[in-house]
């Protein structure tokens, strides 16, 4: 797959099509970098169109040297607001929408390599309203505190380039968002999450770009340092249990997944986030090995990893 340079747009002339073109370039760059780190497979592309307007490119890597399944989705869709969107956005006038972004989830083969998720997006209404959203979070199957600390440090560095208040604010937002009430546990070690961010379009977009561009170097590093670690059968089984909890969150609590399925979104692209294999064991006891219980003990909101 040919790598394309990320498009740089003069901020004073930026419009929705420029933002969409940037996200396409981000998808290209991330796919090229992650495939190079994996070294065992490449991303296959599935282009699709939406009857109401727009379309996207879903790229999936399967059975790589490190990644069992990885998806990088780009979309740019537009058209009349779905009735559920009208209610959700509390819109009282007849308007159309435009939405574009990149969504990523990666599931590794080795249980010591963490699951990662990224989403960066832009939404615009024909009445002139617009906002950005997104986030990046890490879900280790087995939490390694030193790596959790490193991950959060990288996010803080990016956030601090724009505003020192961003990291604590968006870290708390992620703790609250990536939480499964029915399990009373977080999905993983969190990260940052933000939504409905308006303000100055150019400034917010620069922040969103910085988050998107941090993904590949962060995850490539985590892949490299963990992929060769040996693991036991108990640790592999624990990985499937942790994947099961990931599935529960995505299908039961994730607003984007639920909203997409309820508004005639593209099902294959929406469910790209699910792992190829997961398990649910009745009354599972994580005490079968020390790292299992230690991981569940850290699936809590409000941990100051840094």
Where in the sequence are the language-model features?
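Compact, glycine/acidic-enriched structural inserts
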Residues: 126-172, 306
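TerminUS-proximal long segments
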Residues: 267-306
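Gly/Pro-rich turn-and-neighbor structural signature
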Residues: 16-90, 197-232, 236-246
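Short conserved micro-motifs at the rims of enzyme active sites and ligand-binding pockets
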Residues: 85-87, 203, 258-264, 282
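Internal mixed beta-strand/loop scaffold within catalytic domains of large alpha/beta enzymes
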Residues: 58-131
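Intrinsically disordered, low-complexity regulatory segments enriched in Ser/Thr/Pro
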Residues: 118-141, 261-277, 281
């Amino acid at each position: 797959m040919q790598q394309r340079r990320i498009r740089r747009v003069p901020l004073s002339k930026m419009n929705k099509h420029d933002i969409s073109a940037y996200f396409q370039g981000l998808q290209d760059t991330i796919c090229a970098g992650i495939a190079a780190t994996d070294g065992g497979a490449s991303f296959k592309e599935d282009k699709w169109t939406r009857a109401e307007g727009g379309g996207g490119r879903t790229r999936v890597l399967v059975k790589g040297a490190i990644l069992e399944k990885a998806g990088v989705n780009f979309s740019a869709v537009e058209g009349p607001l779905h009735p559920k969107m009208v209610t959700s956005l509390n819109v009282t006038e007849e308007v159309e929408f435009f939405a574009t972004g990149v969504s990523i989830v990666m599931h590794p083969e080795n249980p010591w390599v963490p699951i990662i998720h990224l989403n960066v997006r832009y939404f615009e209404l024909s009445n002139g309203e617009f906002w950005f959203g997104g986030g990046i979070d890490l879900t280790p199957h087995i939490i390694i505190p030193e790596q959790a600390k490193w991950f959060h440090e990288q996010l803080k560095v990016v956030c601090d380039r724009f505003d020192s208040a961003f990291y604590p604010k968006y870290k708390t937002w992620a703790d609250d968002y990536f939480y499964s009430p029915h399990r009373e546990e977080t999905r993983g070690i969190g990260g940052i999450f933000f939504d409905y961010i308006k303000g100055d379009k150019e400034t917010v977009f620069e922040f969103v770009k910085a988050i998107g561009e941090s993904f590949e170097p962060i995850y490539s590093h985590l892949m490299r340092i963990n992929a060769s670690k040996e693991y036991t059968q108990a640790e592999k089984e624990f990985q499937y249990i942790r994947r099961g909890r990931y599935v529960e969150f995505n299908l039961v609590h994730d607003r984007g997944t639920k909203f997409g399925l309820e508004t005639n979104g593209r099902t294959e692209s929406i469910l790209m986030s699910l792992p190829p294999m997961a398990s649910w064991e009745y009354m599972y006891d994580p005490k079968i090995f020390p790292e299992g219980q230690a991981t569940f003990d850290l699936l809590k909101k409000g941990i100051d990893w840094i």
